Swiss-Prot record:
Membrane topology: Multi-pass membrane protein
Higher taxonomy: Eukaryota, Viridiplantae, Streptophyta, Embryophyta, Tracheophyta
Organism, as annotated: Raphanus sativus
Protein name stated in the entry: Casparian strip membrane protein 3
Stretches of the chain found on the membrane's Cytoplasmic side: 1-41, 114-125
Localization in the cell: Cell membrane
Extracellular side: 63-92, 147-204
Function description: Regulates membrane-cell wall junctions and localized cell wall deposition. Required for establishment of the Casparian strip membrane domain (CSD) and the subsequent formation of Casparian strips, a cell wall modification of the root endodermis that determines an apoplastic barrier between the intraorganismal apoplasm and the extraorganismal apoplasm and prevents lateral diffusion.
Length: 204
C-alpha cells in the first residue's frame, strides 16, 4: 500500500514581497521622526541662545535706568537740583518690570533645556509660548510709558508748560534713553524665540 502525500505549492514571491515591504515602511517612519526631531532640536538650541542674550539685555536695561541719578553742581541754601529714576513712577515701573523679566527668563531656561533634550515634546514649547506672550505684554507697557516720559524730558510740552530738562540733566536723560534703547534690543531678541514655534505650528 503506497503512502499518499499531498503537496501544497506556496508562491515564493508573496513571502519575499511581504518581507521586502515591511522594512521599507519602518525605515520611512524612522527617517521622518529623526528629521523632525533634528529640526526641533535646532530651533530649541536657537531659542536657548536667544534667551541668554535677552537676560543680558534686560539686566543691562534695568541697571542703566537704576543708575541714572544725577545731581547738578550748583545748589541754593534750600534747594538741591537732583534727578533720579525714583522721582518718576514710570521709570520705577520700568526698572521693576525689567528685573521681573530677567528673573522669568532665568527660570525659563530649564524648560528651554527640556525642549532640547526632548525635541518632539509639544507641551514645553506651548508653555513657553504662552508665558513669553504674557511677559511681552508687561515689557511693552513698561517700555512704552518710559519712552513717553523720556520724550517729554527731551522735548517738553508747550501745551502743558512742561519744560525740557535734558539741557540741565544731560547724563540723566542719556541713561534713561539708553535704557529704553536697550529694551528695544531685548524686545527683538525675546520676540524671536516664539517665531520658530509659530512657524512650526503653521506647518503642521
Amino acid at each position: 500500500m503506497k503512502n499518499e502525500s499531498t503537496f501544497i505549492d506556496v508562491p515564493a514571491d508573496s513571502s519575499s514581497a511581504m518581507k521586502g515591504k515591511a522594512p521599507l515602511i519602518g525605515v520611512a517612519k524612522d527617517h521622518t521622526a529623526s528629521g523632525s526631531g533634528g529640526y526641533n532640536r535646532g530651533l530649541s538650541i536657537f531659542d536657548f541662545l536667544l534667551r541668554l542674550a535677552a537676560i543680558v539685555a534686560a539686566s543691562v536695561a534695568a541697571g542703566t535706568m537704576f543708575t541714572s541719578d544725577e545731581t547738578l553742581p550748583f545748589f541754593t541754601q534750600f534747594l538741591q537740583f537732583q534727578a533720579g529714576y525714583d522721582d518718576l513712577p514710570t521709570f520705577q515701573f520700568f526698572v521693576i518690570s525689567m528685573s521681573l523679566v530677567s528673573g522669568y527668563i532665568v527660570l525659563s531656561l530649564p524648560i528651554s533645556v527640556v525642549t532640547i533634550v526632548r525635541p518632539l515634546a509639544a507641551a514645553p514649547r506651548l508653555l513657553l509660548l504662552v508665558l513669553d506672550t504674557a511677559v511681552m505684554g508687561l515689557t511693552m507697557a513698561a517700555a512704552s510709558s518710559a519712552a513717553a516720559i523720556s520724550y517729554v524730558a527731551h522735548n517738553g510740552n508747550q501745551n502743558t508748560n512742561w519744560l525740557p530738562i535734558c539741557q540741565q540733566f544731560g547724563d540723566f536723560c542719556q541713561k534713561t534713553s539708553g535704557g529704553c534703547g536697550l529694551f528695544l534690543c531685548r524686545r527683538r531678541v525675546f520676540h524671536d524665540p516664539g517665531c520658530p514655534l509659530r512657524s512650526r505650528s503653521q506647518r503642521h
